[in-house]
Amino acid sequence: MAKGLFDLSGKVAVITGGNSGLGLAFARGIARQGGSVAIWARNEEKNAAAKKELEAFGVKVTTHKVDVSSEEQTVAGYQEVMQAHGRVDSVFANAGLPPPQTRSMLDLSTKEFQDFLNVSLTGAYLTLREGARLMVKRSEAGDIGGSLVFCGSLSMFKGLAGKPSYAGSKGGMGAIVRSMAVEFGKYGIRANSVAPGYVKTGMTGTGELSPLDKFMLIKNAIPRPGYMEDYEGVAAYLASDASSFHTGDTLTIDGGCMVML
């Protein structure tokens, strides 16, 4: 098992939406460094597959069926994690609805807007808030530290026409995360966001490049799309003591898209 600056032995990470996509990539990054993982997701078949994959790294993995838009289920989910693992060291709020169909905000009903925010903003807020509650309690008992991570997007920085609920959820949570960094810093708890660029759901080198992939070759400073494994390292970094003085930030993992003209 890996040791050293990024060693996560004895640490526990809660990852919402951790059974696929970026959430599973975050989980792999934790597991590769010896950390235990608690996956929160509602698809039990995918949960089982993710659990089997991660256990191959020789770590403890549990899965929990949690609807993060429900405060009651979120609190209960953490109770399950504490019973199974005894502690929570990092939380990755990754669960959220996919970007909705592009549509003018003039045509978007208030209910549709609010329904989206219930999961993608309120759900992420509840996930990080209740995780912070456990970390504060642990820190007050003398075991200082913890890491809160929100998975955002480049829409936190750039205008995104036709998807106001998606952009609003990401930008709103970015502000909340910065507030968490200020409020919980005295407990040694960090709070950061990750803003992925364009990411392919497959693994490196699989399949032909799509028209969008080819477009990203000229949009990114590193001329390729992102892949799932590109996000394993940032998870290990943010969960480990290597990031103990890094808080209130948004890490853009985008192949240099944001710096291109």
Sequence positions of predicted segments:
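Conserved glycine-rich cofactor-binding loop
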Residues: 12, 19-20
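Substrate-binding pocket helix/loop in short-chain dehydrogenase/reductase
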Residues: 102-105, 109-114, 216
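C-terminal helical subdomain
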Residues: 193, 214-246, 253-255
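Active-site helix of classical SDR
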Residues: 128, 169, 177
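Short, small/polar-rich loop/turn modules that mediate ligand/substrate recognition or access, typified
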Residues: 185, 190, 246-248
